[in-house]
């Protein structure tokens, strides 16, 4: 039983370098493409997150202001109608 996990680990170790070797042969060109792709995705996600955050933040103060304005208008109407 102890030999089975060792055998699996040995297989993982032996298969990992063979998969990594082609990317290492590509050198900086492969790495720069990956970095470029990741930075592009990161920028898109950041832009989407900022847009979502702005969309969620802006309506809240507007709604509060509108409700305050409506309350003021109601109180003014009530004040003028009483006199």
From Swiss-Prot:
This is Putative protein T-ENOL. It comes from Homo sapiens. The gene is CDIPTOSP. Residues 1-33 are annotated as: Disordered. It comes from the Eukaryota.
């Amino acid at each position: 039983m102890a030999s089975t996990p060792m055998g699996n680990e040995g297989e993982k170790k032996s298969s990992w370098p063979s998969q990594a070797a082609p990317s290492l042969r590509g050198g900086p060109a492969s790495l720069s493409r990956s970095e470029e792709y990741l930075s592009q995705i990161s920028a898109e996600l950041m832009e989407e997150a900022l847009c979502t955050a702005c969309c969620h933040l802006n309506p809240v103060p507007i709604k509060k202001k509108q409700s305050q304005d409506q309350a003021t208008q109601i109180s003014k109407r009530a004040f003028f109608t009483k006199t």
